[in-house]
């Protein structure tokens, strides 16, 4: 994250709005009927002239020194970027990092967080709605306060195809080939099984990911 130069002490709210813009609200798409349409505030974009030369790593306090056993690591990243295996008492791994990266990649492409905590049951509910039921072997090991049987029930009818639907609804400007590239990357990056999740090396060599990078990053 870029460092931000401080405002002058006598700066008014109007001065700050002029420099940063007013907070913009975005509608939260929902595949189910809700009592009230949801909204979220769009993340702040800091102008270049307010950035400092300092740069900060947002590691959520999870950075580890080389040689430190993974099993000694405490804590987890924020829930909406945390892999579901970590939320079921599985140890941290590089596969967990890849899940978090995929959340950021999806948010950049979709301009929307794929998994959030606004639904009943929290972030796991939205993960299940988008990706389908969790592995049954995880049942009983959820670290949160509330666990739901339908999260692990393979017969539960949920929005199994909503990952593709989310891509199509959030990026109607994209063509079918591009949407298929994005779906291919996200399906493998969001695999429930850490061993089957894309590694960083595999992602960089993936033809679908490279096609997207070539288009948007030159």
Identify the function of each model-found stretch:
Residues 61-68, 131-185:
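C-terminal lobe substrate-recognition/regulatory segment of protein kinase catalytic domains
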Residues 1-77:
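Activation segment/activation loop of eukaryotic-type protein kinase catalytic domains
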Residues 109-110:
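Structural recognition of an alpha-helix C-terminal capping motif at a helix-to-coil junction
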Residues 97:
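Conserved catalytic-loop aspartate of Hanks-type protein kinases
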Residues 62, 67, 86-92:
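Conserved region at the C-terminal end of the protein kinase activation segment
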Residues 188, 194-218:
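Regulatory extensions flanking the kinase catalytic core
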């Amino acid at each position: 994250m870029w460092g931000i130069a401080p405002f002058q002490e006598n700066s008014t709210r109007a001065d700050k709005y002029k420099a940063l813009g007013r907070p913009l609200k975005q509608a939260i798409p929902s595949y189910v009927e809700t009592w009230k349409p949801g909204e979220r505030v769009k993340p702040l974009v800091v102008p270049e002239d307010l950035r400092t030369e300092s740069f900060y790593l947002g590691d959520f306090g999870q950075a580890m020194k080389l040689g430190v056993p993974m099993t000694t690591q405490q804590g987890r990243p924020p829930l909406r970027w945390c892999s579901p295996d970590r939320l079921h008492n599985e140890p941290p791994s590089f596969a967990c990092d890849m899940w978090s990266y995929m959340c950021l990649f999806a948010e950049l492409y979709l301009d929307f967080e794929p998994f959030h905590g606004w639904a009943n049951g929290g972030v796991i509910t939205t993960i299940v709605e988008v990706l389908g039921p969790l592995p049954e072997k995880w049942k009983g090991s959820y670290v949160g306060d509330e666990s739901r049987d339908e999260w692990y029930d393979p017969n539960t009818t949920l929005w199994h195809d909503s990952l593709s639907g989310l891509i199509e609804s959030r990026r109607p400007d994209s063509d079918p080939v591009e949407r298929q590239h994005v779906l291919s990357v996200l399906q493998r990056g969001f695999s429930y099984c850490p061993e089957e999740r894309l590694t960083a090396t595999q992602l960089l060599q993936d033809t679908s990911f490279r096609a997207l990078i070539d288009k948007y990053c030159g």
